[in-house]
Amino acid sequence: SPHGEMLFSISLEHKFKTYIIMQQNQTSSKAYLIRIVMVAVLGGLLFGYDTAVISGAEKGLQAFFMGATDFTYTDFWHGFTSSSALIGCIIGSALSGVLASNWGRKRTLIFAGVMFFVSAWGSMCPETMVLPEGKPNLTLLIVFNIYRVIGGVGVGLASAVCPMYIGEIAPSNIRGMLVSWNQFAIIFGQLVVYFVNFFILGDHIAPAIQSIGNGMNEILNGGEAAWAIETGWRYMFGSEMVPAGLFAVLICFVPETPRYLAMVGQDDKALHVLTRINGDLEAENILSEIKNTVTEKT
């Protein structure tokens, strides 16, 4: 009958509109999630960037401090300076769990971003507020290494909290894939900084350093490599300020993880984040699972 056909048509139209709305919501949720994860994996990129930047800068840095008059820059000092960031990595990784639990995942990552930025700036200009520029000495070397340790703290925090953040905010069906993006970002960060160092050096000559025994070395081409010795290594370390500043700013605009929000009793905020990512139907069920898990562990 005409009446039955009309009802069927209305029902079909309603189902079609509902389907379109659901598809739009899913697309919006995926885009929102991808934006969040892309910001978070910048922490992984900085992990790789900070640990690999020394590879291009170490010869210029070594030649620079070999010009010091108040101490001898031996192989010991060179090895310590090249690896001092690892001290910060140990500190950062040891503190990551405490900070993530007390400050939250988001604020801990903001702090890591600030550490990366301060380290990049201080490693580029370690003389700032301490010594006259361009005068290599033991105090300047110590200050430089302090800044590298600060960057290492950022690495230690990012290495633990970035995958934690992604794992807690991603839906279970794609969680493994999204967490793996962080691992890719670490390697990509190392690759990027190799090219950055290459382009910074450009047509300039890198210093050639030869061992003369007993932990001592000499520069074979100091005049030709003057730019790399005085300036090049500074630009290499300073280049990290770009991704570090970007990370520190953008991470302020992503949400805290639903798990942490549930841990501190902010269920409404947790439900809002879950709804944006998973939709209305799944959000309440996921929140209930999170709360049950949190309750069991506490």
Name each model feature, range by range.
Residues 1-21:
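Short, Lys/Arg-enriched N-terminal segments with co-localized hydrophobic residues
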Residues 18-298:
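Transmembrane-helix signature of 12-pass secondary carriers
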